[in-house]
Regions:
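N-terminal Rossmann-like NAD(P)+-binding domain of SDR-like oxidoreductases, especially those catalyzing
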Residues: 1-200, 240, 250, 269, ...
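C-terminal substrate-binding subdomain of Rossmann-fold SDR/epimerase-dehydratase oxidoreductases
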Residues: 5, 18, 31-32, 38, ...
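A glycine/serine/threonine-rich, flexible loop-to-helix segment
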Residues: 49, 156, 207-215, 276
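Short secondary-structure boundary micro-motifs
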Residues: 82-83, 200, 208-209, 291-293, ...
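Conserved GTPase G-domain signal focused on the G5
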Residues: 204
């Protein structure tokens, strides 16, 4: 069955991998990539599919409600996969309102547009029995983060039932957007699904996050700034595995439900950085241990959660998903991609990136 799917944030890191998968795997679908092309949005990420007959790019901002209305009307949007977001914790500490506008107000704009455009197809008769009854098949799929759950202790995993406890402006804004999506499901009977993922890594990642930032710095023999004692722990998920999970949840997930997507793959920051240094030294032909000399411990950031770890058992048992790439394999492939795409890396790290980098990491 044909669909007209709006993917927001489709020129970004995760979004571009989702767009590529949907365009190539489902030729009967028309895929509309909506992106404002802010600093992390890059159409070069999608050059390989830009001429595909079922791919369409729309430059717009989810804060523009009128633009959203026009897009839904013009393209008869049947489904939404919502990835557009401000996503970097450090930036949220500097400019929290930017995160409120995009992640909260932008999401509500999108929800309102979907609700109004699809209302003739949605039945309001089954208000309280937990079922969805629509004449047509619609879905508003909201992609979120494990950071909404707060910080874990040394034991345990985040489950779909874990209470929210956000500790940064970023995670607070994403928690608010999650709540709005579920509220629209309950109040207006909008067919929704939510997923919360762990830390992603892979090709096309803007170098403000740990792995691409440190790859860039190792290439250029710049300091590797590690926050605090380096023992903060994260669960890492290869972005292509995440895109596979999104595809599966979109097609087979239960409407109204939440799914956690994780890599079952915990690393402390310092151990990850040392592994990265080892692999980079081998690939760059450097002396073993050379890049580790670049590690510099810097002042911790405010509200730094100690540990995140996702329990993706529900997704595995109900839909059969599991990660297909080991961390060592994924990291090696990621490094290779950046080494083979140095022009892309230098292009995205010019201009305003340097101002931001100096503000965040110089003289800490």
């Amino acid at each position: 069955m044909g669909k007209n799917i709006l993917i927001t944030g489709g020129a970004g890191f995760i979004g571009s991998h989702v767009v590529r998968l949907m365009v190539t795997k489902y030729p009967a679908y028309q895929i509309f990539n909506l992106d404002a092309l802010t600093y992390a949005g890059n159409l070069e990420n999608l050059k390989d599919i830009e001429n595909a007959p079922n791919y369409h790019f729309v430059k717009a901002n989810i804060l523009d409600a009128e633009a959203l209305k026009d897009i839904f009307t013009k393209h008869n949007i049947t489904d939404v996969i919502h990835l557009a977001a401000e996503s970097h914790v450090d930036r949220s500490i500097i400019s929290p309102l930017d995160f409120v506008y995009t992640n909260v107000i932008g999401t509500v704009n999108l929800l309102n547009t979907a609700k109004d455009f699809w209302k003739q197809d949605l039945s309001y008769e089954n208000a309280h029995d937990g079922t969805w009854d629509s004449k047509r098949d619609h879905l508003f799929y909201h992609i979120s983060t494990d950071e909404v759950y707060g910080s874990l202790g040394k034991e345990g995993l985040f489950k779909e039932t874990t209470p929210y406890d956000p500790n940064s402006p970023y995670s607070a804004s994403k928690a608010a957007s999650d709540h709005f999506v579920r509220a629209y499901g309950e109040t207006y009977h909008l067919p929704i699904v939510v997923s919360n993922c762990s830390n992603n890594y892979g090709p096309n990642h803007f170098p403000e996050k740990l792995i691409p930032l440190f790859i860039h710095n190792i290439i250029n023999k710049k300091a590797l700034p590690v926050y605090g004692d380096g023992l903060y722990t994260r669960d890492w998920l290869y972005v292509i595995d995440h895109a596979r999970a999104i595809d599966l949840i979109f097609h087979e997930g239960k409407k109204g439900d939440t799914y956690n997507i994780g890599g079952f793959n915990e690393w402390t920051n310092i151990d990850l950085v040392k592994l990265l240094c080892t692999q980079m030294d081998e690939k760059l032909g450097r002396t073993k241990g050379e890049s580790e000399q670049l590690i510099t411990y810097v002042k911790d950031r405010p509200g730094h959660d100690r540990r995140y770890a996702i329990d993706a058992t529900k997704l595995n048992k109900e839909l059969g998903w599991s990660p297909s790439v080991s961390f060592e394999q994924g990291l090696a492939a990621t490094i290779d991609w950046y080494l083979q795409n140095t022009a892309w890396l230098e292009n995205v790290t010019s201009g305003t990136y340097q101002t931001y980098y100096n503000q965040m990491y110089t003289n800490r």
